[in-house]
Amino acid sequence: MAIVKCKPTSPGRRFVVKVVNKELHKGAPHAPLLEKKSKSGGRNNNGRITTRHVGGGHKQHYRLVDFRRNDKDGIPATVERIEYDPNRTAHIALLCYADGERRYIIAPKGVSAGDQLIAGALAPIKAGNSLQLRNIPVGSTIHGVELKPGKGAQIARSAGASAQLIARDGVYVTLRLRSGEMRKVLAECRATLGEVSNSEHSLRSLGKAGAKRWRGVRPTVRGVAMNPVDHPHGGGEGRTSGGRHPVSPWGFPTKGAKTRGNKRTDNMIVRRRK
């Protein structure tokens, strides 16, 4: 993995910083694990915009990633290759199981082609192996953590993400997340050892607006640049600061306002995030 700063041969190249990984597979993805991915342009079935700043971008296929790994317990797998996935910040690994089946998983950091991985209670403590939380030693770094047994990984799935198992108490274990939050999770939930690959993702710089458009991201217009009919911050004579605390176009507080409202799982949070 190398960080490459491009030479300023043009204005669009001047600020480009790329993350180059020579281990990534250069060919086509595994076709049986691809699915069609339709673009909505941020519109719903009425044609109205429900998600702003979405539209255009390169065509993509969705890669079917196995977030459970619970039906392959005890079956060893060989990592065939590490691949780029346009649908997520992390890389993905193509596994070939001893029974001949191939599946994609989130690629853990340090795992490369040729490595042997396995899931199940008897799996060794090694990056990329999947176990129930009750079988993972306290202090271990993990990712791809389930919140409900059998539902599949939900916590720590993006590039460079991880959590730490810091305590075990009865049917629960306590995890420390990257945000600083400490929360309880059922010990029968699964997790994968190690941290997610491509931790250098945050160091890249796209360099120009067009690179965002290739990814299907449209421009964001500031509220203070709009008219009063379009945004609470709009209007005014000359340039203004908006005249109130930052809000969304619909008047809800933004830029730091807390939005969590899931009281049902409040008792699972030992310490709120920082």
Curated annotation (Swiss-Prot):
Disulfide bonds: none annotated. It comes from Pseudomonas putida (strain GB-1). It comes from the Bacteria. One of the primary rRNA binding proteins. Required for association of the 30S and 50S subunits to form the 70S ribosome, for tRNA binding and peptide bond formation. It has been suggested to have peptidyltransferase activity; this is somewhat controversial. Makes several contacts with the 16S rRNA in the 70S ribosome. PROSITE patterns: RIBOSOMAL_L2 (PS00467). GO terms for molecular function: rRNA binding; structural constituent of ribosome; transferase activity. GO terms for cellular component: large ribosomal subunit. The gene is rplB. Part of the 50S ribosomal subunit. Forms a bridge to the 30S subunit in the 70S ribosome. One of its GO terms (biological process) is cytoplasmic translation. This is Large ribosomal subunit protein uL2. Keywords: Ribonucleoprotein, Ribosomal protein, RNA-binding, rRNA-binding. Coiled coil: none annotated.
